[in-house]
Amino acid sequence: MSMLREVGIDEAGRGPVIGSLFVAGVLNFEGLEALGVRDSKRLSPKRREQLAKLIEDATEVQVVELTAREIDERRKSQTMNEITVDLFARIIGLLHPDRVYVDAADVNPERFAYNIRKRCNSNMHNIEIIAEFKADVNYPVVSAASIVAKVHRDRSIRELAAEIGTEIGSGYPADPRTIQFLKRLLNDHKDKNSIPAYVRRSWKTVERLCHKAYLYTHD
């Protein structure tokens, strides 16, 4: 009798105004819970890096990335929830699970699970999808996916800052370092469409800063 393939899926980077969105899927394995992956948000960045390597060495892991430019293009016809559903379904298609645990990115977890299933290939419509709030705390396999996704995003932000050659903060709108960087960046550009591709131009934060800087914006 074959072992049930259980997969946890989570994302990192839905809300930032800078950088990519990452979604990770992790296949459950014996010994995962013993690694201490629960409540990943309380882990230090160094510990997350260590755990991500242990997880990626121990089991099947898939990570998909959607760049800021791709997010802007998709948002012309999709909501962020719909985009997230598509990426979660893509992970399912890569890992072929029997049961999936996901951190609900919708106010209605049942609807989120239904929409993911609907976006899966027809031969995967019968898989069990369990969507819950705080699944990254309640299920170690989702905690593991959260760790992997966050490590990939953090690494991407570090690489971007090194490439630009300046401090950009975390990329989140609530980070004063990120806002200061965006203000300096917007002063160097004549209109919104000339802003570098690593900035999510469709974000309200950018619209607001453009308006304050008296920049010409257009669709």
Where would I find each of the regions flagged by the language model?
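RNase H-like, Mg2+-dependent phosphodiesterase core
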Residues: M1-D219
